[in-house]
Regions:
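A conserved ligand/cofactor-binding region detector
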Residues: 1-478
């Protein structure tokens, strides 16, 4: 790879020693493995910056379809080794370190695992990002920049104890803060609607705003000069403070990007989880539409050029948020906005037990997200009307397929309703969804209703091959 500081062993050694001494104002012989890791990571990020920028420019130039992959987790692991290998510079660094008497493995182990994931959901998301970058596909991730990640476990006096995962206590050499792309996200308040010149005017009044600040991390493709982006959103004070206690406002907003999966057994915990989900979904969708409009000057072709991939139900609020932007801000008619929305969204389901499918109490949902609730309610009303028209004497079918029922908002039903592509994460998983847990939804819909929910059984496919799924999403034309 043509990276100036890594072109050969001699050049890299000189640049590396100089950078260590200049950054820390010490003799190189006195540098620690951690200091060497920081300099190595920063040098690599600096050298792949041109590829990163060129990847963005080439996507714009080609007017290519772009996937925005939303997940509450990205279990990335240590990135330094993978990045060195994908950039094609690992052999140069290894030989240079051997000649300098540095143990590369020890330097690699100075990196703290990014506290962005906990299990299979996050590992799948991380594999997606690595694979699609290596395939040269324009796919960019969205997540929260959790300060403390999940938690670390230990044993004390024979008992398990948990500690915060302070993965950001040291420098994150990969991230770049992008203040200019910050977004302010509203919570609470109430909605005032009126008509002006035949157009619906919606105003969110008395809202409590939180600023979402993006931090970008490069995802380097395997020896192909492609660098995609994982964007992490951090919660900070908005430009206008709410008319409440400032200390309480700061405490609550800091919690949004504090940790992965806060305890939701309490009312406050439920509010925080729903806040987290809307926070990064709204910021990511707004940002994606801004980028799209800079290139195409319109949102009417959004479904031809953008896909929002919903990784499990946590980002399912993409559906009403996209509708909100298209109807309230872009002033599209509902039917046109809904057509665009359901041709933009793809959904991966990770849960096979019906009782574990994510649901939100209606009162909490409507209080925290008043406009999103109104839109979700309208999606549900229209869908139920169509089911009712087909099965006028069978209310059980209507109830079993409803997005909102019995005081709950069913997020999996919402994601399926708007998804042009729905899949499980394994063949068995998908079969269980089709024939057991979501059987009522799938088997009771005719071809007309399948346009709204899924193309009958064919809309479900297993996640057998990351490449095939992403190619299908990128090549999809409604």
């Amino acid at each position: 790879m043509n990276y100036p500081n890594f072109k050969d062993v001699k050049t890299f050694k000189e640049a590396f020693v100089s950078n260590v001494e200049n950054k820390y104002a010490i003799d190189f012989e006195c540098s620690t493995p951690y200091q060497q890791y920081v300099v190595l990571g920063e040098m690599l990020r600096y050298n792949i910056a041109k590829d990163w920028h060129n990847t963005i420019l080439e996507t714009k130039k080609q007017k290519a379809k772009v996937v925005y992959y939303f997940s509450m987790e990205f279990l990335m692991g240590r990135m330094i080794t993978n990045n060195l290998m994908n950039a094609g510079v690992y052999p140069v660094v290894k030989q240079a370190f051997d000649e300098l008497g540095i143990d590369l493995n020890e330097v690699e182990h100075q990196e703290t695992d990014a506290g962005l994931g906990n299990g299979g959901l996050g590992r799948l998301a991380a594999c997606f990002m690595d694979s699609v970058a290596s395939l040269g596909l324009p796919v960019h991730g969205n997540c929260i920049r959790y300060r403390y990640g999940f938690f670390e476990q230990g044993i004390r006096n024979g008992y398990q104890v948990e500690h915060p995962d302070r993965w950001l206590k040291d420098i994150n050499v990969w991230e770049i803060r992008k203040d200019e792309e910050s977004v302010e996200i509203p919570f609470y308040g109430y909605i005032d609607m009126n008509s002006e010149n035949g157009k619906l005017q919606v105003e969110h009044k008395n809202a409590e705003y939180v600023k979402a600040v993006p931090y970008d991390i490069p995802i380097i493709g395997d020896n192909n000069h492609i660098v995609n982006t994982l964007r992490l959103w951090s919660a900070e004070p908005a430009s206008v403070y709410p008319a409440t206690d400032a200390f309480e406002y700061h405490r609550k907003l800091r919690e949004i990007s504090s940790m992965l999966y806060p305890n939701d057994e309490t009312e406050e915990g439920k509010v925080l989880r729903l806040k987290q989900q809307y926070f990064f979904v709204s910021a990511g969708v707004i940002n994606a539409i801004r980028r799209h409009k800079k290139i195409f000057k319109t949102v009417k072709n959004l479904d031809k050029k953008v896909v929002f991939h919903i990784n499990d139900t946590h980002p399912a609020l993409i559906v009403p948020e996209l509708m909100r932007i298209l109807v309230d801000e872009e002033h599209l008619e509902w039917d046109e906005a809904w057509k665009i929305t359901k041709n933009c969204c793809a959904y991966t389901n990770h849960t096979i037990l019906a009782e574990a499918l994510e649901k939100w109490p209606l009162e909490l949902f409507s209080r925290l997200l008043p406009r999103i609730y109104q839109i979700t309610e309208e999606i549900n009303r229209r869908f139920q009307n169509e089911i009712q028209a087909k099965y006028p004497d069978n209310q059980d079918k209507v109830k079993s397929m409803a997005i909102i029922y019995d005081g709950q908002v069913k997020m999996a039903h919402l994601a399926i309703a708007a998804g042009f592509s729905v899949n499980g994460v394994a063949r068995l998983h998908t079969e269980i969804l089709k024939h057991q847990e979501l059987k009522e939804i799938i088997l009771r819909l005719n071809m007309i209703m399948a346009i709204i929910y899924m193309f009958l059984l064919n809309k479900y496919h297993r996640l057998k091959n990351i490449m095939l799924v992403m190619q299908k999403i990128l090549n999809y034309l409604p």
